[in-house]
């Protein structure tokens, strides 16, 4: 089997059902489609059962969180590549039909981590066609720079990726002390560190911005992740700092990607940190009337004024001290995990919170 198309679905809407029906039509000798519904909606379940066919598996699951749904569906995939789809987005028929042939051509080339193409993005009043520059390059520094040069929603998270790589990165991210909405950015970073993305000259995926288009509603979605992890809304102020720190720390210190020279690792880490730190400085983040707003603003001002003067350990200490104001247990878990990463020790996750959501894009 060359390609596994995976849909974990919770929405009971007709739109979601129509997207799933379309995906089921792609099933064939080289493409398996696996749908796992955890909505608990009886009418939807009855409809989905009619979509089952050869190489198309419909799984009716009990209501559960999105992370569990994704974990369970991934266990069933047999394709060399996996293509993860959201049930409210849209894949293009001709692109999907082209994927098995492309996988046949590139499958033995271990320098290829995944497949990219053109992406359609729907806004409230306009549409756009976008692509990522240079992520098909053999040069890892150019790949990461190309990813960072794109300023729109992270549609690369919906790209066909080698199943082995997908599972490896998924397993690692599930060891993180908390899952936040920016972790889709870091997942893509880890993909790019592992290899290039072969380019398909077709529209591959349509992403509807929906609530992510308006800054305040987008940040409310971010806040859902933080609340699920047990955080006060004030942590939202540090959103892009956390992304900057975690991504750069991983580039410098972990070994779940091929051998990359230390000089290149340092360049990529610096590039990642500086790019995300610019977002931290330039993107106004809400605290939603948190009683810790003052402390969050003081820390942001301190860190923004200390550019280039703090080590990773210094930044970790500052973050952990702030998180301790919100929860000492969570602060200790965060510090212990990232201190292990920085010290090149194997981190041990402490289950202080059960993540209920999985990152799915965002601006």
Language-model segments: residues:
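A short, conserved alpha-helix in the catalytic core of glycosyltransferases
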Residues: 165, 169, 177-201
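Acidic donor-binding segment of Leloir-type glycosyltransferases
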Residues: 21-60
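Conserved donor NDP-sugar-binding/catalytic core segment of glycosyltransferases
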Residues: 96-130
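Glycine-rich, basic loop-to-helix element that forms the pyrophosphate-binding segment
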Residues: 61-77
